[in-house]
């Protein structure tokens, strides 16, 4: 099994074209490409998403992804869950898989811990409620100002951060493997690692603090994450990915 990892796609899958990602020539459905959040392939939750998902299904490999903050969480609620390599997934297409929050998967003899989500940093000017009687007026005013805002259940979802039950499930699954995995796949990263490259621009939250707990308690080889739209290695074992596609050895 070959495993490749990349960063945010936001529904734009051009990096996986055969003339760009040429390694796929020798890949099969047993091989994986993992996306570290902000997958964006299910944004509308209706047939408008089908072209991109069908294109991924036509690739010779299997696409797997965790969710980020720019995702339509409502659109995932109707997909059934199933067990896959020791953890829970949602099968979007036969070979397009959502790797769920707080799961541990065993792939090719290696353990992967996945944790979904991140805080949106483009909501400084607020989150509008579609049911607000003044919604249209407020929306137009914010648009004209070029404000950074989102609309609840249209472009922002509270589920971008885990619930208490999901944190408990994540800890229980890590306990089950004695806090010992090979790789961690997430969208954002621990608060302490965030501080190294951002100088405090990105603020800590419950998820990044949980990741610091994982960092301290868990034995792992590498931690791969997206979210920050750059490619960078921090302290040798934390790999920030955006458009780069790397191969696990």
Predicted regions and their residues:
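Active-site-proximal beta-strand elements of phosphoester/diester hydrolases
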Residues: 1-10, 109-118, 185-187, 239-242
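Acidic, histidine-bearing metal-coordination/catalytic regions of metal-dependent phosphoesterases
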Residues: 1-15, 134-135, 146
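Residue-level detector of alpha-helical segments with a strong bias toward transmembrane helices
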Residues: 17-18, 48, 78, 119, ...
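Internal alpha/beta domain cores that form substrate/cofactor-binding pockets in large enzymes
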Residues: 161-249
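Generic domain-boundary/flexible-linker signal
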Residues: 14, 44, 74, 123, ...
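Core catalytic region of metal-dependent phosphoesterases/phosphodiesterases
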Residues: 6, 12-107, 200-212, 216, ...
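Catalytic metal-binding/acid-base residues of hydrolase active sites
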Residues: 9-10, 39-40, 69-72, 118-119, ...
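Active-site-proximal loop/helix segment associated with metal-binding centers of metalloenzymes
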Residues: 110-201
């Amino acid at each position: 099994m070959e495993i490749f990892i990349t960063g945010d796609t936001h529904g734009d899958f051009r990096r996986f074209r055969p003339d760009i990602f040429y390694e796929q020539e020798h890949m099969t459905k047993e091989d994986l490409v993992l996306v570290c959040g902000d997958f964006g392939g299910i944004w509308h939750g209706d047939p408008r998403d089908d072209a991109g998902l069908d294109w991924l299904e036509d690739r010779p490999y299997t696409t797997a992804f965790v969710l980020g903050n720019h995702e339509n969480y409502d659109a995932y609620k109707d997909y059934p869950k199933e067990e896959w390599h020791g953890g829970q997934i949602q099968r979007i297409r036969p070979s397009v898989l959502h790797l769920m929050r707080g799961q541990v998967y065993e792939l090719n003899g290696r353990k992967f811990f996945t944790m979904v989500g991140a805080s949106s940093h483009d909501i400084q000017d607020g989150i509008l409620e579609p049911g607000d009687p003044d919604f249209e007026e407020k929306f137009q005013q914010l648009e004209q100002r070029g404000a950074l805002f989102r609309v609840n259940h249209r472009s922002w979802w509270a589920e971008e951060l885990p619930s208490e039950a999901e944190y408990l499930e994540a800890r229980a699954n890590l306990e089950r493997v004695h806090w010992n995995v090979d790789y961690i796949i997430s969208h954002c990263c621990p608060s302490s690692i965030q501080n190294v490259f951002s100088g405090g621009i990105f603020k800590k939250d419950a998820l990044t603090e949980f990741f610091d707990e994982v960092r301290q308690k868990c034995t792992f080889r590498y931690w791969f994450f997206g979210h920050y739209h750059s490619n960078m290695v921090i302290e040798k074992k934390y790999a920030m990915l955006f458009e780069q596609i790397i191969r696990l050895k």
